[in-house]
């Protein structure tokens, strides 16, 4: 039988692994064939069966396996009795304190030895297939993902197959060509026959693919992977010429102008396109050619296939100018660049330059790369360049950084959310005002943040490689990851500012002010002319370049953009920093905050909310915006944007006192409630805190009492909160599952409620008695 174990901070014994902080923050799963007691194995199997039975009711998993492991290792038992609020009963201070303490103790018990909180950060169903395809075409699938891994991959695929036989872009999505074709190919590569798979999974999937025209209708991102596999032809893909790397960096089409994630995907993919790399045409590949196309492979008009896309995958239509651009490259540029003499001079030089960038990014990120999509393409490119080379071996050693195991099987995450979740968890615990009770937990969390702050800028001449400085800032996952993010920096900075005001006997050695100054410098560097904040690098390319967005299912991916929630986090952090260290760049910070507030006001929707890009959606954006505006001194009385936002939140409150928003808001940009007007506890927490920041407790606390009651009564017996719909978002169309959110935000909201609502009520009551 065996069990899976989550390991923390390991890697020092692998000669192909490097780290700047001794692997602090690294989380990897290992299968122990002889591990686990019979009771433990039964518990895991019960969790798997419960998930599968209820998978169409709640699509994201509860991420139970590592939590069961940690709670068992720490011998955790919830000792604080549960108290619920009955109908007609007022919430008192003791009841909410009881719920807060129960949740805080549960959160403390799930903290890792490194000080962060492990968690699943996934949902895009398409993350997994490129890894299976990539490892298959280079011949390393069975060594990297042996039998137990493959068993969990298949479990994951079966768990997330829709009732119609397809898979969507993410867990809650309807069937798409992209998701269905990718998962069908995975099942076949992993040994399932054309009629195999659980509940006839393969045949049901293939029927959906063929009924929608076959895989020539897969979106662009799928065409390239199927071309590498040999199930598609490269001439059916729109051009990705590596020669763009040879253009002057100021040229609009140069990758230097791109959003960093787009640039780093384009980088290795342009190399593979330039090489027209195709894996071995195995008997399986030949079978897939027959199974997935509606006509014989050699009769397909590949040039026409370049512009085909199933309507289910089409979130935004390509403008005619983009198709003209691709057609010109395909018809005129590529025939010249792939023939003598230009192929020997220009193309080969372009490919060499491209791989220089690939190797730089690999080394700068310790071969983790910015995300799973980028990682696997870089790994395949390194193998194509040199199958026995050290870069490829180092890539193999970092694959486990992306593997996550839960009760629904094995997935590939986008990237770990260690620092982001830690910064939010720490602030939630600090808000509880249980400093002595939670002291050891807070100290470990602070140690993790200190160990995760970037020690240096990217290596070498990073500006020549189109990277931004990042010394003193924080990344989304770990220090080794190396891709610095502003919102992670802002939230981590606020934690460090809180700790700077706490007794050293509780939090230990404090971060030097100079290291906080470095974080502030990074934040100040990313403000755009409109006052908004980008997240990774300054906005370089013009927004008009989005007309060339090659992905049919994502928006705003070509260049960097400003984000409401990132801007709000920056305001909060710098307001707090300015109070603690008023002498550092004070005038610049004041000007920064003024411009950022103006950006928030300008980006408010006419009906009151703000659009969030990284969370669903209007609830997420509105929570952050109200928090940022309040931090900058804006109130319900002096800022017209706040009453509009409050009106929106009050109008969308559900009957049970909560709030619930569908991921569909992201694509339509119109507020869309969850089906059945049901509530979501994480979104309820966002709305509750947003209203608290607006001063709602002073006007009418009734809506706040209703939502707090829902949170308290929804808490589970051990202090956890139940998993519900996904609450993260990726580029407008893809729901993201941040499993840690269900523990962080309800706790934070109840702590804010106790302090700012019940505390206010208590003061008012005391004043009335005294009068």
From Swiss-Prot:
This protein's UniProt keywords: Isomerase, Repeat
Species lineage: Eukaryota, Viridiplantae, Streptophyta, Embryophyta, Tracheophyta
GO cellular component, as recorded: lipid droplet
UniProt key word Ligase: no
UniProt protein name: Taraxerol synthase
SUPFAM superfamilies referenced in this protein's UniProt entry, alphabetically: Terpenoid cyclases/Protein prenyltransferases
Organism listed in the record: Rhizophora stylosa
Catalyses which reaction(s): (S)-2,3-epoxysqualene = taraxerol; (S)-2,3-epoxysqualene = beta-amyrin; (S)-2,3-epoxysqualene = lupeol
E.C. numbers: 5.4.99.35
Superkingdom of this protein's organism: Eukaryota
One GO biological process term: triterpenoid biosynthetic process
Pfam families in alphabetical order: SQHop_cyclase_C, SQHop_cyclase_N
Catalytic-site annotation from UniProt: 487 (proton donor)
Pathway(s) where this gene product acts: Terpene metabolism
């Amino acid at each position: 039988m065996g069990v899976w174990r989550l390991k923390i901070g390991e890697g020092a014994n692998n000669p192909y692994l490097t780290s700047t902080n001794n692997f602090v923050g690294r989380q990897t799963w290992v299968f122990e064939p002889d591990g686990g007691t019979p009771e433990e194995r039964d518990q895991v199997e019960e969790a798997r069966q419960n998930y599968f039975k209820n998978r169409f009711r709640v699509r994201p998993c509860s991420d139970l396996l590592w939590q069961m492991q940690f709670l068992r290792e720490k011998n955790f038992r919830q000792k604080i009795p549960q108290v619920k609020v009955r109908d007609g009963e007022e919430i008192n201070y003791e009841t909410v304190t009881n719920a807060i303490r129960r949740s805080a103790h549960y959160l403390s018990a799930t903290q890792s030895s490194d000080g962060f909180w492990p968690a699943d950060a996934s949902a895009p169903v398409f993350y997994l297939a490129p890894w299976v395809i990539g490892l298959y075409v280079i011949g390393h699938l069975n060594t990297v993902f042996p039998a137990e891994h493959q068993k969990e991959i298949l479990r994951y695929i079966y768990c997330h197959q829709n009732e119609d036989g397809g898979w969507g872009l993410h867990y809650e999505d309807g069937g798409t060509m992209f998701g269905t074709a990718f998962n069908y190919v995975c099942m076949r590569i992993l040994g399932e026959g054309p009629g195999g798979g659980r509940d006839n999974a393969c045949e049901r999937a293939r029927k959906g693919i063929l009924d929608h025209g076959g895989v020539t209708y897969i979106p662009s991102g799928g065409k390239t992977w199927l071309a590498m596999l040999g199930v598609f032809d490269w001439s059916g893909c729109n051009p990705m010429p590596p020669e763009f790397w040879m253009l002057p960096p100021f040229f609009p089409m140069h990758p230097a102008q791109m959003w960093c994630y787009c640039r780093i995907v384009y980088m290795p993919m342009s190399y593979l396109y330039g090489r027209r790399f195709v894996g071995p045409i195995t008997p399986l590949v030949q079978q897939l050619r027959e199974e997935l196309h509606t006509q014989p492979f050699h009769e397909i008009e590949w040039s026409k296939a370049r512009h085909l896309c199933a309507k289910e995958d089409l979130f935004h239509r390509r403008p005619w100018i983009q198709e003209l651009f691709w057609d010109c490259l395909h018809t005129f540029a590529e025939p010249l660049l792939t023939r003598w003499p230009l192929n020997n001079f220009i193309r080969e030089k372009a490919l060499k330059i491209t791989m220089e960038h690939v190797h730089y990014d690999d080394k700068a990120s310790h071969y983790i790369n910015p995300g799973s999509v980028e990682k696997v393409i870089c790994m395949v490119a390194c193998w194509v360049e040199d199958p026995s080379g050290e870069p490829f071996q180092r890539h193999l050693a970092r694959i486990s950084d992306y593997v996550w195991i839960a009760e629904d099987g094995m997935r590939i995450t986008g990237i770990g959310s260690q620092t982001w979740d830690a910064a939010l968890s720490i602030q939630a615990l600090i808000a509880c005002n249980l400093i002595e009770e939670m002291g050891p937990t807070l100290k470990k969390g602070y140690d993790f943040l200190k160990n995760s702050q970037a020690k240096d800028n990217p290596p070498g001449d990073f500006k020549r490689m189109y990277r931004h400085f990042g010394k003193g800032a924080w990344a989304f996952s770990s220090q080794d990851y190396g891709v610095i993010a502003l919102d992670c920096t802002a939230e981590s900075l606020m934690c460090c500012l809180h700790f700077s005001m706490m007794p050293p006997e509780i939090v230990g050695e404090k971060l030097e002010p100079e290291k906080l100054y470095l974080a502030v410098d990074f934040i100040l560097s990313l403000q755009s002319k409109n006052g908004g904040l980008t997240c990774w690098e300054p906005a370089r390319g013009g927004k008009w370049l989005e007309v060339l967005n090659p992905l049919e299912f994502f928006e705003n991916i070509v260049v960097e953009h400003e984000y409401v929630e990132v801007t709000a986090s920056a305001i909060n952090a710098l307001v707090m920093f300015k109070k603690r260290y008023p002498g550092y760049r004070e005038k610049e910070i004041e000007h920064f905050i003024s411009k950022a507030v103006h950006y928030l006001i300008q980006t408010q929707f006419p009906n009151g909310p703000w659009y969030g890009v990284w969370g669903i959606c209007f609830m997420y954006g509105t929570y952050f915006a109200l928090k940022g505006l309040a931090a900058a001194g804006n109130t319900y009385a002096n800022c017209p944007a706040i009453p509009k936002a409050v009106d929106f939140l009050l109008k969308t409150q559900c009957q049970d006192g909560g709030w619930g928003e569908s991921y569909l808001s992201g694509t339509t940009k119109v507020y869309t409630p969850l089906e059945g007007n049901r509530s979501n506890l994480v979104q309820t927490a966002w709305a509750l805190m947003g209203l608290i920041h607006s001063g709602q407790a002073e006007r009418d606390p009734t809506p706040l009492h209703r939502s707090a009651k829902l949170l308290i009564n929804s808490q589970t017996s051990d202090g956890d909160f139940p998993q519900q719909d996904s609450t993260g978002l990726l580029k407008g169309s893809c729901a993201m599952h941040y499993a840690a959110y269900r523990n962080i935000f309800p706790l934070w909201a109840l702590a804010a409620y106790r302090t700012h609502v019940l505390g206010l009520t208590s003061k008012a009551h005391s004043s009335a008695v005294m009068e």
